[in-house]
Amino acid sequence: NQPLVVVDGTPMDNFTGGVDDVWGNSGADMGNGLSDINPEDIESMTVLKGASAAALYGSRAGNGVILITTKSGRKNEGLGITINAGITAETIFLKPDLQNDFGQGSVGVYDNQSRLSWGPKAMGQMVTDWRGNQIPLHTYDNIDAFFRTGTSFNEGVSFQQNIKGTAVFASVNRSDDASITPRSKLNKTNITLRATTFLDEAEKWKVDAKVNYINQNAHNRPIQGVNPSNAFNTIYNLPRSLNIREFEDDVDEQGNMIWYDASKNPQENPYWVTRYRQNEDTRNRLLGNISLKYAPTDWFDIELRGGTDYYTTTKSEKVYAGGNTSPRGLYTEGSETFYENNFSFLATARKDNLIDRLGGFVTFGGNLMLQQRNKMNASAGELLVPNLFSLNNGVNKPTVTSELIRRRMNSLYGSLQLNWDG
């Protein structure tokens, strides 16, 4: 049910990562395709709905269109150079209203293996903790204790020039983000080149060409959903009388994860997760388009356009030995390649008082869309040699799955609107 995202007239794939399965387990937060756009390059955004969306983009616009127009340099006369730099800090804005009266356990009885917080009232009385030590029973603020202040550093420079009907725009932007979750970071580089020019002195023929390259590298994206590796889920549901700081030393002398929960399906120590359950991914993306527009009169024009959206993503997940999932560790890797090419034409006529006080607005267009998505995932399963991350180092043969999806869409669309100047 997503709207169609169109950047400078060309549709882009607004993929979403980390979609929930039937159990609410969505894996790593992979973000979405729209986040690849550099916000500093955006000139305007428009939301189209209903007939106006369908008239321009056909059946793909059934859920509406987010129309993004990026900077072209045409608004500035002469030469312009812009340098920007910014630092942003983020913390958890809203926290659930958690009770701070009762400790670990249920029905008023203390239990050092319980995940619940309905044990005895925490009044400093002595209890035996999960290590077998005698400690006073208190409650703790584990949310602020575990999560840190996230930071985002953004630096960019843009160049724009408009001389004699030709406009040029170029920009380079770099962002380095450190998440509120420890050891999680995201780095992104965005490069844009665009040129717009008229081919004749009467300015009836116009050419617009643009290319945008994005490189993104992520380390330890946070895990989402009902997942034992989800730090948010673990911290928010941790018994109120457990101090998460006790688990910063996350492995014992044998290299096994330290954690209070010895049940059959325990959650994982969130400190251990950030160090020993590592995921990495790299995405390289290219967005490009070129258009030729002819406007013989001030009320009629026709435009031909070609555009492409191409990206590759490689990813891997390493689970070290000593955790709950596998005593020797796990290793998986995967890749995805996607492209979508669009070729379209659109004729537009708008004229008031065409016949007496009757006017109208007419559009007619067509589009050829070619799309392909190729996915491959491979897993070594449980490792034969602990912490040697290779597909050939599995106890069993590696499992490989692949998926190839091709789509082609030919469409014609148009609209007619009449108006009466009363």
Which residues make up each language-model segment?
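Surface-exposed loop/interface segments of Gram-negative outer-membrane beta-barrel transport/assembly proteins
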Residues: 2, 7, 75-138, 180-184, ...
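Short acidic/polar hinge/loop motifs at secondary-structure boundaries
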Residues: 10-49
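Alpha-helical support elements that line or immediately flank enzyme active sites
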Residues: 22-25, 288-294, 308-310
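A beta-strand signature from Gram-negative outer-membrane beta-barrel systems
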Residues: 39-82, 152-154, 175
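Residues on the lipid-exposed face of transmembrane beta-strands in outer-membrane beta-barrel proteins
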Residues: 70, 83, 151, 157-161, ...
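Outer-membrane beta-barrel initiation region
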Residues: 96, 145-149, 159-163, 251
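Outer-membrane beta-barrel channels and translocator barrels
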Residues: 163-164, 200-202, 295-297, 352-357, ...
